[in-house]
Amino acid sequence: EEQIEMMYQGFLKQSGVPESQIPPQLVPMVKGMFTNKPFIEGPWMDKYNGKYYLQYACPGAQFNVYADGVYIADSPLGPFSLAKNNPYSYSPGGFMPGAGHGSTMWDKHGNLWHTSTMRISVNQQFERRVGIWPAGFDKDGELFCNQRYGDWPRVVSSEKNDPWENPKWYLLSSGKPASASSFVEGKSPFLATEENAQNWWQADSAESGQWLEVDLEKAMDVYAIQINFADDKLDVPVPGEIKGTMTQPRYIDEYDRVTRWILEGSVDGENYFVIEDKSQVDTDLPHDLVVREEGLQARYIKLTILEVPFEQKPCISGLRVFGIGDGEKPEVPSFEATRSDDELDLLVNIQGENAVGYNILWGHEPEKLYHSWLVFLDRDKIYSKERIEKRIGALVKGQKYYVRVDAFNENGITEGVVIPL
């Protein structure tokens, strides 16, 4: 109690808030933040077929395992019971992991969607983006969210969609060679194809015309290119008064910034054609998606950056190319799955062939593999028979589970077999 009181008083001093301004009924809640007791935040509730689904965020926005859980009740005030399908929103792998502090809503076509925040957390602890994934209720009324390939483009039509439909286009750029006009030491072009939003290529100059190019190693059918800009220790003079509190100072920039670039493609590396020209736009999109439904043939994808906000050295965390390869899909992977002694962790050992990565799926019934972890092979291990291991701390003690491992590459997805854990 003494330690909690000290931390509480330190919080008041740091935030500049007199204790007299905190309503007495809220003091226990504020002090609760400094205990080891778990707490929930970001509550959201949906009603479906007479049941109430209380969703909440598990604290830890800076971690890849940031997630949303769900409780179910017959009344909006409870009593609530923990759903079997927890954590309901959980996307710990891939280019940009994290899926916590979210909301669930219907669109006008009857599709259910879940939005949550995704982690970057490099420049600041709460540096995040917002993701959106297909969700739904199964025949037993269980709420689910499909995040199997959660940061890949997916087709959305103006009608009822299948929330479990696999991606139409596959990732072509993972681990592929990259080159650039220049780069800062430790921020090489290769980082733009590493599938990790916490790393990025950075040009060593803020001069307009810096470029980044990805080599797919052979001409492929390209349907979409995702351009992900990053911030790198921005040092920008603040032109006005900084407001907020000591713990959350902020200045709202009302100036219209722009992000301008030209995207080109080439089959031979000598003759280039323009895919998208945004040299004159008035928009500032840090994450942009260029789609070509008809497809195009390209081996080289080149991004020339003309302008970014605050005249910074441009950074790209992912120049991600999606399409369909002309080779074979991966082999069905072999794997072993065991459970830790405390029943909270899933231990998976995988060996496959001709894969870029694997998707580990698990759930409490064989046909309800609602949870997933997307795993990429290291650049020098792609397509090899390298054995990989993954420890997943996301099981509910005492609950039965089933596991499946799928393999994927630029040519497609190969589903594995389901085994009991």
PLM features: residue spans?
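Recognizes extended acidic, P/S/T-rich segments that occur
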Residues: G357-G398, E410-V417
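Beta-propeller blade signature
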Residues: D68-P76, V130-D138, E264
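Aromatic, loop-rich ligand-recognition surfaces of beta-strand-rich domains
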Residues: E195-V274, L285-E343, L347, E353-A355, ...
